Amino acid sequence: MHQTVPPGRAYDALALGGRFRGLPAWAVAFGGGMRAVRSHAATPRYRMPVLPNVTATRYVTPLREGGSLPAIVEADDLGTYVVKFHGAGQGRKALIAEIISGELARRLGLRVPDIVTVDLDPVIGRHEPDPDVQDLLNASPGRNLGIDYLPGSLGFDPLAWTPDPGFAATVLWFDALVGNVDRSWRNPNLLVWHGDVWLIDHGASLYFHHAWASAAKLVAKPYDASDHVLATFIDDEAVTQAGRELAPQLTDDLLRALVDLVPVDWMEDEPGFDSPADVAAAYVTQLRARVADPAAWLPEVGPARPARPPAPRNASRPRWLDR
């Protein structure tokens, strides 16, 4: 993660041992504790600052794994970001979901790369030969979304590592709350970086905002965890217990503060609403209703998979050595 700290963003170092109030025990035990936590994370009321804003200075390379064609971009704060563009297929709603869900996950003690808004002049990509990239940049002038680039991070492999049950239960409960369908075995959207696991790519969550007219019907929609990458590591009781601990943290103050992080202009001209304030209120109402009745949407995950036994000490010893 880049070393510069944008103005107005104070951090408290978290020493090992979990002395940070309100941090789940697993967040300390898992990977040696969080590297940095916003200084106001433990306060009962939430006064979140506006997301930091940077200006893109260099288009580095497109990321072709995703259909929306995000890119690695350098910015004027000397940081490097994965930028998602408002001119991509899902438009600004995917960026809104990234902010609300990503920052909600952070407030639940999960690791999420820093999120910023990125001012973009399409001219920075003028030397990019791909016409699809040119079209996307030209469709995305102005404010876009940046997610801190984690250099050297690796994709999470559930076959190589058994996650802490508390961590797995928290992630699944969070994904169920926001309706995140993009945490599957095929595409975990989890990165391992410096020994910690980080959550990324929440643009497919909050799918209710694609059909506001029927959003109320989706409040109690059960979450399908059959393909969730962490479902086999926990049982129903673990997810329920995670909810008992997490739901009280999601107060009206916090939900409003999360939604207030979204740039106002991204909520303009929404069909069925008179103003961006009405759109923001609708997000809070939907999330509040979801938090209030988790029994309606919590998935059944069945019994946890037993932990893998340790490999025999000489498991990799060639047989011919024993002849």
PLM regions: where:
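Phosphate/dinucleotide-binding and metal-coordinating scaffold of catalytic cores
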Residues: 35-323
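Leucine-biased recognition of intrinsically disordered, low-complexity hydrophobic segments
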Residues: 14-16, 23
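Extreme N-terminal basic, low-complexity initiation segments
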Residues: 1-13
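A cross-taxon signal for low-complexity, glycine/charged-rich
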Residues: 16-17, 33
